[in-house]
Amino acid sequence: MAVISETSDEGSNGGAANKKPQEEEENIPPIPKELPEELIVIIVALVRRYHYPKLSLISKAYRDLISSPELFQTRSRLGFTEPVLYTSIGFPPFDLPSWYILHRISLQFKQITSLPSMLPGSAVVTIDYKMYVLGGFIGLNQPVSTMIVIDCRFHTYRELPSMQRDRGGAAAGVIDGKIYVIGGCKKRYNDWVEVFDVENESWETVPGPYPNVASESVEFSQYAVMEQKIYILDPLFCLTYEPRKRRFEAWGRRSQQRRYESCCVVNDMLCTVDSTCSHGYPIVVYDPKGMVWRPVKGVQSSDLPNLVYYESRMANFGGKLVILGGNQSRDRKDSYLEKDIWCIEIALEKREDGDIWGHVESRSVVLSSSKWPLIALSRSVTV
């Protein structure tokens, strides 16, 4: 790039006496009026996500960019994606469940009014920045086949093709980029298992054989994906389903697994809360090889708030175990009035000797209410 310097009329700077500044300026490459699209995507990807709503107000071009898959892919490639925690909380008997998002700075749940209430018995799975909500019950336990997808970047949703069968209390999991849904209807149906192609947005029936040990009318309480298998808690038995081999396996009676009302997978470990501390610790991890539950050492009951753990919900939050649970806090008059929802974040580590150790990194009240909350579920997405 040429540099324009001041010159005297006599050319005393040693340059050509007759060369004018305008001639040197012609050597400067023109500044592009528009930045390359690839550079714009990278620049916006570097901006913190909470600024996106304001950016989207600038112009339609920004709105299109912020909603584009290219921006998410660029953020993922640059390592700028972040986990976001969602939960569905109701206040029975009058208030239907609403979606809430955890704000990382204030550590408070904020209600999302733009999303519909999640039906009781819905199955929910996540893929990147999307949550898929399948089935559920309406009225007097009438199952439905509906399916919606929630875009967690903008808290919008749209309907997807319905399942082939009405389902309530089904299990679901994402394997190889496809959504498998199991049960939630009579087992005698040939479409007891269905698979949803996310790219083509189409359903297909997955043929049997189906497990003989599962209940005839199945409503699963919990499910999670680990080692390319869907782990399912049946009312009577614990099952795994391996879609690649189309194979079901039983891994013990549920009575032997005690009452584990919530579970999630963190770092390929199936975690749950054992409120009875039958293993000496309140958190346990399932060992699929030994088919036994093992304690998470280092986390004592005294490290955790006094919560109603059989109504708690768990999630994998950026590689950490998160537990959401409610308790009642006393006011100054020592009467039970305010109900709190706590968020506990626990780091897990599997050591060389096979022991699992945990450390409570944070515990805080994230929502308070005069009504008793019912936490329907907790999920983490990447945005």
Swiss-Prot record:
Residues spanning the signal sequence: none
Q: Which Pfam families does the UniProt record give? A: F-box, Kelch_FKB95
- Which top-rank group of organisms is this from? Eukaryota
Q: Where would I find the F-box domain in this sequence? A: 29-75
Name the record gives this protein: Putative F-box/kelch-repeat protein At2g29810
Which SMART domains does the entry mention?
Answer: Kelch
What are the boundaries of the region Disordered? 1-30
Residue ranges of the Kelch repeats are: 130-177, 178-223, 262-313, 320-371
Q: What PANTHER family does the entry give?
A: F-BOX DOMAIN-CONTAINING PROTEIN, F-BOX/KELCH-REPEAT PROTEIN SKIP4
Q: Does the keyword Phosphoprotein apply?
A: no
Q: Does the keyword Repeat apply?
A: yes
Keywords of the record = Kelch repeat, Repeat
